[in-house]
Amino acid sequence: MKNILFVFGTRPEVIKLAPVILELKKYPEKYNVIVCNTEQQKELSNQTLAYFGLKADINLDCMKPNQSLLEVQTRILTALDKVFDNNKVDATIVQGDTMTVLCGALASFYRKIPVYHVEAGLRSYDIYEPFPEEVMRQMTSRVAELNFAPTEKNRQALLKENISDDKIFVVGNTVIDALFCLSEETLNSAKEY
């Protein structure tokens, strides 16, 4: 059995990783799914998990008022280090380009644990736009063992960065899969917003 750690902290990350989490949970004989929320967006991420009938196994509560980017990064990396101390992890899955994504990728890389990057290959090629996300997604793709690109254009961007073709898979955008995971009741209640 493989122990798969999902690391996220924002609502968009939950939405785009929920279908992958739910799919792997269908195979408990193959995968032990560990769901870790850094709570970068505490209320929004936990509320969104509930829409999918999910709960985090580990809540890190890393956010404090008025933190600098360096302070956020330090808190998340330190908290994830403890997660790895307390859990055997065979692979880490992250999505997108947030501080949580970069920290999940780096913490795994430092322990030689494979990183799988969902929504890889999005690029502006301007390190200050979006800031700091452009650098975060480039660094995450660089250390990822597998990169799941939404489109062929994203695959081409990764190839231009000398990421090996056998580490890139064009899979579409998991936000579409997320729609199919939600109940009709949940979708109808969302119309109120």
What are these regions (language model features)?
Residues 1-39:
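N-terminal subdomain of nucleotide-sugar transferases
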Residues 3, 90-91:
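Structural motif
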Residues 29-75, 79:
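Conserved nucleotide-sugar phosphate-binding/catalytic loop shared by glycosyltransferases and other
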Residues 83-90:
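Glycine-rich phosphate-binding loop signature in dinucleotide/nucleotide-binding domains
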Residues 117-131, 145:
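A short, histidine- and acid-enriched strand-loop-helix "catalytic/donor-clamping" loop
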Residues 133-146:
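Membrane-proximal helix-turn-helix segments that form the acceptor-binding/catalytic region
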